[in-house]
Each structure stands twice: as C-alpha cells, then as structure tokens.
UniProtKB/Swiss-Prot annotation:
Pfam families: S-AdoMet_synt_C, S-AdoMet_synt_M, S-AdoMet_synt_N. One of its GO terms (molecular function) is ATP binding. This is S-adenosylmethionine synthase. The lineage of its organism: Bacteria, Bacillati, Bacillota, Bacilli, Lactobacillales. ATP binds at residues 16, 174-176, 241-242, 250, 256-257, 273, 277. Residues 100-110 are annotated as: Flexible loop.
Amino acid sequence: MSERKLFTSESVSEGHPDKIADQISDAILDAILAEDPEAHVAAETCVYTGSVHVFGEISTTAYIDINRVVRDTIAEIGYTEAEYGFSAESVGVHPSLVEQSGDIAQGVNEALESREGDTDDLSHIGAGDQGLMFGFAINETPELMPLPISLSHQLVRRLAELRKSGEISYLRPDAKSQVTVEYDEHDKPVRVDTVVISTQHDPEATNDQICQDVIEKVIKAVIPADYLDDDTKFFINPTGRFVIGGPQGDSGLTGRKIIVDTYGGYSRHGGGAFSGKDATKVDRSASYAARYIAKNLVAAGLATKAEVQLAYAIGVAQPVSVRVDTFGTSTVPEAVLEAAVRQVFDLRPAGIIQMLDLKRPIYKQTAAYGHMGRTDIDLPWERLNKIDALVEAVKTVL
C-alpha cells in the first residue's frame, strides 16, 4: 500500500479579532512612515467589545491622528454596524504610546561594528533585538508556497470579496478557513481531504443556504476541481450558528496569528511577530529577507524546497548565523548554497532595508491574508530578481 500523509493549514479573514489588531498596528506604522521614514515603531493593539487599546514604543518626528487611523481601518474591514458589537465610529480608542528605550536605541542607531570603527554605512544600524527568523519556499504552487496555506488564504479572501461586493449579502466580517491536503509517498499534493470554513453571518441566514453558497461560490471557485473528489469532506459552520463574531465574540491581539502570516506550519518559525514593527526589527525584516532568499533559490532550480534561517544579536549588524536547508532536494551541496547566499544578499539590517526598500508605508496590506506568497500585491521580498546572481555565485563557489 502506498504511503500517503495529510497536512493541514488554516487562515483567518481580515475581520478576525487578531487580524483587526494586526491591521490597526500596521496602519499606524504606515501612517508614521509616510511622514517619517526613519521612525522606530513597535505598535501593539488589543481589541474587544466596543474598545481598542493601542500601546507600545515609538520614536518619530511625525504626528498622526491615531484615533482616525484606528476608526478608518475598522471601517475598511467592514465593522460599520452597531449590531456587530464593534463599530468604527462608536468604539472607544485608547492610545498609550511612549518613546523607544534609549538603551535599545543606542544599539540600533549605532551598531557594534560601527562603534568598533567600521565605516560602511550599512554597518551603522544594529539589529533591534536578538532572535532567529525563517524563510521558506517550495514548488507546490506558482507562488512557491505550500498548498494548504495557499488555499486557506484564497478561501477567506474569496469570502471577503463576496461580502464586500454584496453577492452574498448576509456575510459578516469574521471568518476562518482550514484545508487538509493529502500528499503521496513522494510528498506531492494529490487531493484535498477536508475543508473547514466558519463564517460570521446575519441571524436570518440558514445553515442550508450558507453551506450551499460557501461550497458553490467559495470552495469550488478557489480549489481546482482536480483536487476535489467524492471523499472530500466539507465542514461549513459546524457549530450551527456564527452570528456573534469579531471582537464581540473574542478579544484580539497583535501578533497572535504568526503561523497564518507565514507558511501555515509547513516550515519552522522563529516566534517573532511582524505587524506594528518597523524594519529595524529583524523579526520582520529578516523574515522577509529569508523568504526572498528561499524563493529565489527554488526559482533558480537550485532546490525544490528551501528553508533559510537567519539569526541576530541585538545591536550587531552582521547575522550571527545563516543556514540553508533543502531537505535533500538541492542540486549542489547546501554549504555551497550558504556561501552563495552570503555573496549575493547583504543581510545586515540596513542592507535588508536597502535591498527591499523597507522604509515605505507598505505594511498594512500585508496584515491580512499572509505576508508571504502574495500574488495580489507587489511585495519586494516576493520578486524573483536574484536568480541569475545566485546561479553565478554558485558557479564561483564550486
């Protein structure tokens, strides 16, 4: 009997409480960067019934109307009705932001290398904290992402499209998806085994109507027919009712959906969240750089699967480690790939910021439906512009 395995990933909609918090944090970051690209920002958000708290550390010359940014973000998501228990114009907004610690700032503003005499401008900025970050790519999808998380994101994005267009008028903003994919003995996806979708809805909507609409207009519109068969299981609103949702149903916090934000559990994660952080925080910028490296390695044909780990010390510019793992799929030794990566990519924080142009207000758009593998927006870490350089670097190393 051939050995087959299942793997499951989930996603959540922009109206999920944790994602509301992420989007508010990144909307604040973008508003600040639009006025002050050199700002240091660590903005956290908590949402619950009727209230939003924004707190954290910020050093900037910009002045922004946080109250307005918060309300506009909530309205864009779709929380505009008082009956939702959380409405853009009626929530209480409570900001509590202070200046970044001087002890941290001195290591970020002048890295150890700079203090020791390195005059390279890109050695001037130190990492904003210690930590380890992972990036991943695999040739399962055109965007080089694992199939389970790719499908999960597409399902909740489709729900949002149908809600905002009015095609399914009873939908409300909160939703979750989960997709289980079956893999063959060669680790190739062969079918979708299970799809779970829970979507918030108006009280008059019936379970039968919701199931029919979600299967026909969401699942079958997103998942290729070749992956669906008579044995594929659908669980649509399996509790039977999902009227109370969003922050009325659960509180939400920035940074609680880090697996949704990345690879759906298919790859390792260093533990650091992204939203609300400027690019001097390597939790964010180095994770983007690691994805950029992994995607270009796979696209270059140097591996069919690649995971890149980067690690940093606070106040130090150069990474303390760079690791490439291809799970036995590389065409050359992994040590060669690591050497090529170091040759092609400047992985100092300032190098990453320059390479990916990360001082721009581009972050709010990443705060729902994944930071990696996006095909609907132009993100610099998704570009395949290092393929030739990597191939040439491998030749020089060999």
